[in-house]
């Protein structure tokens, strides 16, 4: 009996031991499974990018020129084949005397204009004398009302004792030949020097008679002064136009050998104020579209100044709300200009920017001026009509003997 009882107790002890052992095995299995799942999760997290790849730095060798990302945005696209109202392009160089753009058969130029509703193009760089005459004979005379040409000043004669009188006579001759305005390149105030080595400032008194003569003749002066703000900063990894400047190093005006952008514009603005009876077109949105507060002050202060946006679609298009407010406020002072050669797609890109509310699309020439996109302004019809042609007609209507472009 005692032996049986003892055996029962042993059996009971073994049973309990087996139970604890099973429980231990089950717990161990659960812990092992949890650890395995955790490791699997960590591995999964590594795979979907929660941790940097070990060779990430090694892979950062893609050249900037080869980086061409395709936006994944799904936004409406409204292509505008023809401008809503006919256009006067006040800033072009097609078939000019300087050869700024590649020469194009005049018939093809007219075809592009007809296809896009561009009525008249102003060829700014006509030079003077025989070179001016060639532009007039090729582009102006055969196509009445479709082209106008502006003359230029011969700055190589700046040191002549009678420079002012000679240039006034040259200007009078240009207008007699058919020139309808005067174009001034950015060299004045930036790189042009007299024989003493002194920089010729835009408000140099020797030039005053020329500006005054333009007022007397009733012709506007289209003037390009300075360049984008980034051109006056170091060409380094912080410059938003780095790619453009390494491709065109002569466009960089950073360094002690150049005057500051601000000083050049200040001289130009003093000149504007000194000649209130002459109409000036401050090209490229007064050459500070990055600073529309400055342009606003200029227009508020000087009623004899107009602006246009040639080659500055990129700058204005990336600040759509600010730019739209500006265009609405100064709708009587802004004219349509391109400064981008002659191309249907170029004009249509500008129309899309002005007429639609499309978002995040390429400016014309992207990424030449910088790696950003632009946004449409969807301007009201009354504003579009002024910018497309009415403002230009008001200014160019001052010309004597000009064909009725309406």
Residue ranges and their predicted role:
Residues 2-21:
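Bacterial N-terminal signal peptides that target proteins for export
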Residues 19-30:
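Bacterial N-terminal signal peptides
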Residues 37-142:
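An N-terminally biased module of ancient metal coordination in phosphate/nucleic-acid-related enzymes
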Residues 46-66, 84, 193, 229-257, ...:
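Active-site gating loops and adjacent loop-to-helix segments of metal-dependent hydrolytic enzymes
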Residues 88-92, 121-123, 149-151, 182-183, ...:
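Hydrophobic faces of well-ordered beta-strands that scaffold small-molecule active sites
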Residues 96-104, 124-133, 156-165, 192, ...:
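Acidic-and-aromatic substrate-binding clefts and catalytic sites of carbohydrate-active enzymes
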